[in-house]
From Swiss-Prot:
HAMAP family associated with the record: Azoreductase_type1 (MF_01216)
Cofactor mode of binding and number, as noted: Binds 1 FMN per subunit.
Swiss-Prot/TrEMBL catalytic activity: 2 a quinone + NADH + H(+) = 2 a 1,4-benzosemiquinone + NAD(+); N,N-dimethyl-1,4-phenylenediamine + anthranilate + 2 NAD(+) = 2-(4-dimethylaminophenyl)diazenylbenzoate + 2 NADH + 2 H(+)
EC top class, as a word: oxidoreductase
Assembly behavior: Homodimer.
Binding site for FMN: S10, S16, Q17, S18, M96, Y97, N98, F99, S140, R141, G142, G143
Protein name: FMN-dependent NADH:quinone oxidoreductase
InterPro entries: Flavodoxin_fold, Flavoprotein-like_sf, FMN-dep_NADH:Q_OxRdtase_AzoR1, NADH:quinone_OxRdtase_FMN_depd
Disulfide bonds: none
Family: Belongs to the azoreductase type 1 family.
UniProt organism field: Escherichia coli O6:H1 (strain CFT073 / ATCC 700928 / UPEC)
UniProtKB keywords: Flavoprotein, FMN, NAD, Oxidoreductase
Length: 201
């Protein structure tokens, strides 16, 4: 039995293409892997605080007493990291906003990236500590950006996930959804076909 963590990060709720596709993924996965446990965390409806000068002090080893706000941030960081490490498959629904990921998803990453916990520095360079996972990124875009200079989502997510130790990453693209109903429908159809292929593996 595997444990699957689904991270939603769109601000558009039910109108979101990435949310719709991640819901489709969950439906298909449950149909094919009924014994697996699935956890869904919506980073828009349950937002993560923005990392600032006060909160970053909570995430670094220190003997200094923590403020109540720092204590809350550290507890949340511990919770998010424990959840991440407890799951085998990580599904990230990542819409493109202004060429990059949403603020909601970036805030999540800022709280799970902790030296000595999810990565460490060695004589040979950084080493990820969140290993043995598979990641599936479902990314939606209004335009066409894949393999082009305007796609900052794909390299960023590949780099971040690899940095913390998740190197088995597959991407599902839904592009051109702002180019009209026909193009949007094709984007959804192509993305669902890619999801079907991944689920069937």
């Amino acid at each position: 039995m595997s444990k699957v963590l689904v991270l939603k990060s769109s601000i558009l709720a039910g109108y979101s293409q990435s949310n719709q596709l991640s819901d489709y993924f969950v439906e298909q996965w449950r149909e094919k892997h009924s014994a697996d446990e699935i956890t869904v965390r919506d980073l828009a409806t349950n937002p993560i605080p923005v990392l600032d000068g006060e909160l970053v002090g909570a995430l670094r080893p220190s003997d200094a007493p923590l403020t109540p706000r720092q204590q809350e941030a550290l507890a949340l960081s511990d919770e998010l990291i424990a959840e991440l490490k407890a799951h085998d498959v990580i599904v990230i629904a990542a819409p493109m906003y202004n060429f990059n990921i949403s603020t909601q998803l970036k805030n999540y990453f800022d709280l799970v990236a902790r030296a000595g916990v999810t990565f460490r520095y060695t004589e040979k360079g950084p080493e990820g500590l969140v290993t043995g996972k598979k990641a599936i990124v479902i990314t939606s875009r209004g335009g066409i950006h894949k393999d082009g200079p305007t796609d900052l989502v794909t390299p960023y997510l590949s780099t971040f996930l690899g940095f913390i130790g998740i190197t088995d990453v597959k991407f599902v693209f839904a592009e051109g959804i702002a180019y009209g109903p026909e193009m949007a429908a094709k984007a959804q159809s192509d993305a669902k076909a890619a999801i079907d292929s991944i689920v069937a593996e």
